[in-house]
Amino acid sequence: MENRMNELVSLLNQYAKEYYTQDNPTVSDSQYDQLYRELVELEEQHPENILPNSPTHRVGGLVLEGFEKYQHEYPLYSLQDAFSKEELIAFDKRVKAEFPTASYMAELKIDGLSVSLTYVNGILQVGATRGDGNIGENITENLKRVHDIPLHLDQSLDITVRGECYLPKESFEAINIEKRANGEQEFANPRNAAAGTLRQLNTGIVAKRKLATFLYQEASPTQKETQDDVLKELESYGFSVNHHRLISSSMEKIWDFIQTIEKDRISLPYDIDGIVIKVNSLAMQEELGFTVKAPRWAIAYKFPAEEKEAEILSVDWTVGRTGVVTPTANLTPVQLAGTTVSRATLHNVDYIAEKDIRIGDTVVVYKAGDIIPAVLNVVMSKRNQQEVMLIPKLCPSCGSELVHFEDEVALRCINPLCPNQIKERLAHFASRDAMNITGFGPSLVEKLFDAHLIADVADIYRLSIEDLLTLDGIKEKSATKIYHAIQSSKENSAEKLLFGLGIRHVGSKASRLLLEEFGNLRQLSQASQESIASIDGLGGVIAKSLHTFFEKEEVDKLLEELTSYNVNFNYLGKRVSTDAQLSGLTVVLTGKLEKMTRNEAKEKLQNLGAKVTGSVSKKTDLIVAGSDAGSKLTKAQDLGITIQDEDWLLNL
């Protein structure tokens, strides 16, 4: 009996691979269903023999309570965007300056959700969302219901792979047909449907919706030499990879490929929003390294935005957490890039004046980067004596007089007690990239603020379950979850807190760099502008903004209050002893290493106290050079920087 179960699992997984991955089924649906039912019956009779890679794991109505946070072992970086051929040529020049013989891999940019899959001994252990690149959500049970994701690899590998989870157009249409029949609101586009499906707590719904994936990266160390090799290896493991790709050292040929795909993309069975161009050599990728936000060895070309005409019906003015007042146009609805658009940003008052935008105008609307609807210009030939738009003089939230500074393009409310600003600051503090307090969204912030229960971020930590229960719509179970999420956030690493404070010019990446350098929020608050400005990737603007923020008396009081509530001020990332052998040294790795992988070398250097960077400069203290070292070695020699080899590093 056990042998028959093993045979059925093997057969059904092979047939599923032929159907979902290879698009070449060798058995009929009825034959598959017959074998599947036989397996289900055997598993019901012999549950002790159920295999971890059984296809029956992909179905069922398991209801989850929520999704836990997941710390990625290997960060997921975003990509630099390009919107023109000129930007691609500039990227090519930057790469060729370091590596004249570099070739590129051009791949389709699938319009879905980035996911990370970790296998231990060949068995899928964790499937997670990208999140902020460092911390995502564990959605393993949902990803097990995606039919082309292997539950068990043929080899007993420990591997982490990355890819895009998407909803095919055919599946999207089927879902919306069902929603229409049930009188439910339809999904606007396949990407929204995929995102909503992956966040479903009922895994049975996920199984029915026929999501799919394309894998494109091995995040864990690999012995492969090129991106092309990686894709071939991923396919050999049973993953779906996209075959619409091109390898070329010529950006002209890459551009021709882009033009062809853009013309034909409507015929693809899934949505794409551009082409990703990567340096094909993994060794060159390592050499080129990363900026604070993105790899230097890749760029994402975004297709030009679709444009439609619409009429401006009215304009709403809203104030954000920094006091900037933003105009949003209400439009006659139009279909744009697969979405119904009825609102579009007008950016700021200077933009309105420059474009002479008026209520009643017919305007050209587009999606900036295929994401945010915006007004491009006015169709003057259709203007019919519309009145000039009335620019507000008073804040729409607090009624204070608005100001328009000479060096700014926007109107600004400078009242620090403006209700909308306070609510926006509170929502930002609790948001995913900041303190990540689950359940503490804008609607809850509004209720708490209106009930006079919170007025600044420290008030969040005063809240009790009883306070939350006084709000409309909050039951005991929800109140308890929110309270525990608040308490849990106290233990976050301090870069989350720093970002949550909403300091101008200080984003999440800069927050991490600052806390890596200073280790503690209090130490950062007392640091000089010069010491902050000297950190790679930052500069004078951020340093001045931090200095201005921390010298305020009310900020010092806020930090004292947060301390009294035991909110963590320490950076919880990897720290090294100041007496480590390479403590404080900036080191660059270059060339091909023979006895250790680049990741192993980088980790060893960091454990010895070094800061490993991707480029050689006057701030570089040491370079470790392997064979075939290129321009970085030459530059280090010109600058008189100490040069060591791989054996030196091994012997440390």
Swiss-Prot record:
Species, as recorded: Streptococcus agalactiae serotype III (strain NEM316)
Q: Tell me the domain of life.
A: Bacteria
Keyword annotations for this protein?
DNA damage, DNA repair, DNA replication, Ligase, Magnesium, Manganese, Metal-binding, NAD, Zinc
The cofactor named in the record is: Mg(2+); Mn(2+)
The record, for PROSITE patterns, names:
BRCT, DNA_LIGASE_N1, DNA_LIGASE_N2
For this entry, the protein name equals DNA ligase
- Spell out the reaction equation it catalyses: NAD(+) + (deoxyribonucleotide)n-3'-hydroxyl + 5'-phospho-(deoxyribonucleotide)m = (deoxyribonucleotide)n+m + AMP + beta-nicotinamide D-nucleotide
Its function, per the record, reads: DNA ligase that catalyzes the formation of phosphodiester linkages between 5'-phosphoryl and 3'-hydroxyl groups in double-stranded DNA using NAD as a coenzyme and as the energy source for the reaction. It is essential for DNA replication and repair of damaged DNA.
The residues listed in the UniProt record as binding Zn(2+), with positions renumbered to this chain, are C395, C398, C413, C418
Domain BRCT residue range list? 577-652
- Coiled-coil blocks: none
Q: Which GO terms describe its biological process?
A: DNA repair; DNA replication
* Keyword rRNA processing annotated: no
Task: Show the GO MF annotations.
Answer: DNA binding; DNA ligase (NAD+) activity; metal ion binding
For this protein, the Enzyme Commission number is 6.5.1.2
Q: Which family does it belong to?
A: Belongs to the NAD-dependent DNA ligase family. LigA subfamily.
Binding-site residues, NAD(+): D29, S30, Q31, Y32, D33, S78, L79, E107, R130, E164, K278, K302
Record-annotated active site = K109
Q: Which GO terms describe its cellular component?
A: cytosol
